[in-house]
Swiss-Prot record:
It comes from Francisella tularensis subsp. novicida (strain U112). Binds ribosomal protein uS19. The gene is rimM. GO terms for cellular component: cytoplasm; ribosome. Belongs to the RimM family. This is Ribosome maturation factor RimM. InterPro entries: PRC_barrel-like_sf, PRC_RimM, RimM, RimM_N, RimM_N_sf, Transl_B-barrel_sf.
Amino acid sequence: MSQDFVEIAKIGATYKLDGELNLYPLANSIETLISYGDWYIQLPATNVWQQLKGESVLKRADKVYIKLANINDADTAKKYVNALIGVPKRALPQLAEDEVYFKDLIGCSVKNINNDSFGVVVDIIETGANEVLVCKEDNSEYLIPYVKQYIVSEDLNSKKIVVDWEYDY
């Protein structure tokens, strides 16, 4: 399958003896994930996405679980622990011109207007007020607010971000 996939959840440990597994969504709501349509799974030992069929997603209190079709015991379910759940990138909503998916920022090189390197984006922190790029360069880590005031340019095709930021901020 040559489609580009986006990870939307990760499978955790088994939950019940009937093969139910913990599901850790990478979105704010399970409803958002369900709206994407067909889900695909990538087992930890492979790099192949396979379509899921007949799975059930259950929400109990603030926890989410997945029951995979034809998996009826915890021992069989264990091979799915740490598997990724994804959807084809085309299933995601189109973004406005000034919007990006966080996953597209991961791996971007970050330099300032003086061409000083902050390394690459390894994570994004959601603070409530704004997002913060977590950049790593060698043994140093830099936190750069992801707001228009500091982002000079982004070229996600070439994975480059230019910021108006200094080492000592």
